[in-house]
Amino acid sequence: MKAKRAIKIGVDLAMTALFLCQMGYHMMDNRAHEWLGIALCLLFILHHALNGEWHRALFRGKYSAQRILLTAVDILLVLSMAAVIVSSVMVSRHAFSFLGLHLRGLGRQLHRPATMWAFVLVGLHLGLHWSMVLNAVRKKTRRKAGKAAAALYVLLVLAVGFGAYQFVHRGLWMELFRLRELAFLDYGETLPYFLLSYMAIIALWTAGSYYLSKLLKNRKKSVKSA
């Protein structure tokens, strides 16, 4: 069981790292972008194969507000990733060129907003499962964090603030709704700064969904105790 959990964590970390790299497609060769995309797709399929119990439990049990939120985010993430995969095949110049598709125009219109929605939903998904990560860390350390917790909280606030700034500054919110045709690509920025910016954007959505989940949990407890 521990081995399976370790594999799950490894797959999730690899997916997140690959997704971050893929967001910087303008910094890499197009052929590499396509093959890394295929690797990300395979990891996504493996992730669902390892979490088969989620599919089996969809129609079981009661749906609290928290479970509705979690399920909605997960389903939307699956749909957005499916759109990313389909549009990737449509715009492919290398890996799927043998298919002879002539749908690049339509594929481009779908690919960027689908990717951006998937990116945001990955952050939301991480946040809704973040309590499990924190519990595992607490069990491992077996001590109260104290000053370390306060420092991490300050770091989180800074990361969320920076992520919010980057999300607005880069106009990523506009890409969610196709409010502009061209993506904001700064070819002069360094790779470390780009990765730091997008990690902060993920932190923004992760923190948002984590604290929303906590709010729904506390609300449920207060209703039960009333």
List the model feature ranges, each with a label.
Residues 1-226:
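Membrane-embedded alpha-helical bundles that constitute the cytochrome b-like, heme-associated redox core
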